[in-house]
């Protein structure tokens, strides 16, 4: 993806580092995640307690910074922090990591396979950034739909990130 979007060597390295480490704390138990939140003074909401899978983005960012000092930059850590929920005013690299994680080839759900095909096919008359934004919006829509249908809590950051992209698309 970095090549498709013409990232600089430095940005490519930052994105690559974040991609390698984005799930570094994913296998930790909810109790271990809460302990890491205390250690790193990370605030979390009731949403995180209801959906513990969200913790790993925040804890992973801080853990990676601590464990890989000098390799993991604050920018790479921010990419890790937002790779699950997104955020308002997402950067190009944040969108790329979120999407790469969401549509990676190990994801076999039909809707994600379709989204992966949509992303990698020719964007038609749209420029690449518009195509990326449209794909990220579609990814958020799939995520929200899945969470609604399975009766799970939806994180406010995801809704805000999605709405932000839609509002900006209209301008």
Regions from the language model: what does each represent?
Residues 46-58:
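Active-site metal-coordination segments of metallo-dependent hydrolases
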Residues 34-40, 54-55, 70, 76, ...:
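Short amphipathic alpha-helical segments, especially helix-boundary/capping motifs
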Residues 12-45, 60, 78-86:
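His-Asp-centered metal-binding catalytic motifs of divalent-metal-dependent phosphohydrolases/nucleases
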Residues 56-66:
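Alpha-helical segment that forms one wall of the substrate-binding/catalytic cleft
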Residues 1-9, 21-25, 66-74, 81-171:
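Divalent metal-dependent phosphate-bond-processing catalytic cores, especially two-metal-ion Mg2+/Mn2+ enzymes
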């Amino acid at each position: 993806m970095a090549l498709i979007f013409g990232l600089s060597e430095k940005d490519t390295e930052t994105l690559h580092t974040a991609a390698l480490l984005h799930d570094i704390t994913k296998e930790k138990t909810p109790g271990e995640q809460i302990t890491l939140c205390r250690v790193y003074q990370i605030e979390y909401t009731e949403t995180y307690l209801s959906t513990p899978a969200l913790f790993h983005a925040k804890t992973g960012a801080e853990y990676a910074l601590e464990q890989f000092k000098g390799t993991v930059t604050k920018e790479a850590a921010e990419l890790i922090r937002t790779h699950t929920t997104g955020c308002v005013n997402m950067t190009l690299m944040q969108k790329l990591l979120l999407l790469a994680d969401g549509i990676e080839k190990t994801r076999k759900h039909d809707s994600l396979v379709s989204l992966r095909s949509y992303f990698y096919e020719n964007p038609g008359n749209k420029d690449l950034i518009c195509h990326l934004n449209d794909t990220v919006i579609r990814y958020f829509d799939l995520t929200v739909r899945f969470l609604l249908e399975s009766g799970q809590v939806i994180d406010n950051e995801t809704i805000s990130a999605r709405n932000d992209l839609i509002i900006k698309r209209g301008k």
